[in-house]
Curated annotation (Swiss-Prot):
Gene Ontology MF terms: structural constituent of ribosome
UniProt biased composition (Basic residues): 1-12
This protein's name: Uncharacterized protein in HIS3 3'region
Positions with biased composition (Polar residues): 297-312
Record organism: Lachancea kluyveri (strain ATCC 58438 / CBS 3082 / BCRC 21498 / NBRC 1685 / JCM 7257 / NCYC 543 / NRRL Y-12651)
Region (Disordered): 1-21, 291-317
Cellular component, GO, one term: mitochondrial small ribosomal subunit
GO biological process terms on file: mitochondrial translational initiation
Length: 341
């Protein structure tokens, strides 16, 4: 079911008083046309007292043939605001794509060996040693596979270290793809972006004003002390930096009341951690400096004169002007004739 593919099954209650730093339950939405029938695409209908379009649940079905749910849409609006940012979430290099941790995890071209063995910097030493022992046990099988693939290169030793490394990666990808399925450990953590966004990095975004090269959104500073500036952007707490002297002066003058002001922020990067926490990095966009403002005010710009338009002529006026012109021409011809006589 694609609706429950991103957020793992949680053991926490639906209404928990403990602080939450990321969504713990999957949100299901129904359309207005099916809300009056209380149809949510589940195995059973929802009681008619529920008026919201968003619910969270623990079990699709129980022994009592009931779905445990709660009407809650707090994280839904955070997801919509994040999608309005237009930022594609990225992943740390050295880890396989969490959407494809099974047989297709070898598609990660940055670190193929770590992707195949499912090893990252957070892996324990015992797990790494266990994976290496499993790889060493495949040495004989790898020789047979290499002999069947290219016996001439193995016989004449006409291969380089890079060729051998590529062959090893290809052999491991085949063996991992045939011997293992979906990693059971991936079912206990957030898969991919947790349904937060499906934007692809490098995608060209258009707007009525042209191509959008930078995401600029309003935000508020949360603290003024220390080098680690925090800002509230789109319902998330982002790591923000500022090198503008104007912004620093405003921070110093306002102190804790800096939260009353809005600043434009450019969101540079966003990535989702294994526990579902969203990390944003943004920079505040400074305004025009005082030096540039003085240069702009010192320049004299000549304003283009306004274009005058001739008034419209009525049909009666045009007829009157035509008669006057005809009389002038007639009198001019008669006067010339008298002089000639």
């Amino acid at each position: 079911n694609s609706r429950i593919a991103h957020v793992p099954k949680s053991k926490k209650p639906l209404n928990s008083a403990s602080p939450r730093f990321h969504p713990t339950h999957q949100i299901i939405e129904t359309k207005p046309s099916t809300l009056h029938r209380q149809e949510w695409g589940l195995k059973s209908s929802i009681p008619s007292k529920v008026q919201t379009r968003y619910i969270i649940f623990n079990d699709l079905d129980t022994l009592e043939r009931l779905t445990t749910f709660e009407p809650n849409a707090g994280s839904q609006w955070s997801r919509l605001r994040f999608q309005e940012l237009g930022v594609a979430p990225s992943y740390n290099a050295g880890k396989s794509n969490p959407l494809f941790e099974g047989s297709s995890s070898s598609s990660n071209q940055l670190v193929p060996l770590s992707s195949l063995l499912n090893i990252d910097p957070t892996s324990s030493r015992t797990d790494v040693e266990k994976k290496l022992s499993q790889v060493k046990s495949l040495r004989k099988v790898f020789k047979k596979w290499l002999l069947s693939k290219d016996p001439e290169a193995l016989k004449n030793k006409s291969f380089s270290a890079k060729d051998m490394s590529d062959n090893a990666v290809e052999f491991l990808s085949e063996s991992v793809g045939t011997n293992t399925g979906l990693n059971s450990a991936s079912l206990n953590k957030v898969i991919g972006t947790g349904g937060l966004s499906y934007n692809i990095g490098g995608r060209l975004r258009q707007s009525p004003n042209g191509v959008v090269s930078k995401t600029v959104v309003p935000g508020r500073f949360l603290n003024v002390e220390g080098n680690d500036r925090l800002a509230a952007i789109g319902g998330f707490v982002a790591n923000a930096g500022s090198s503008s002297p104007n912004t620093s002066q405003i921070d110093y003058n306002m102190g804790d009341f800096i939260r009353e002001l809005k600043f434009p922020f450019a969101v540079n990067r966003a990535f989702v951690q294994d526990n579902g926490k969203v990390v944003l990095r943004a920079n505040v966009i400074s305004g025009m400096s005082s030096k540039a403002r003085m240069q702009m005010s010192g320049k004299n710009y000549q304003q283009r004169p306004s274009r005058t338009t001739s008034p419209a002529v009525n049909p009666e006026d045009s007829t009157k002007y035509a008669e006057e012109l005809l009389n002038i021409l007639t009198n001019f011809d008669s006067g010339n004739g008298k002089k000639l006589r």
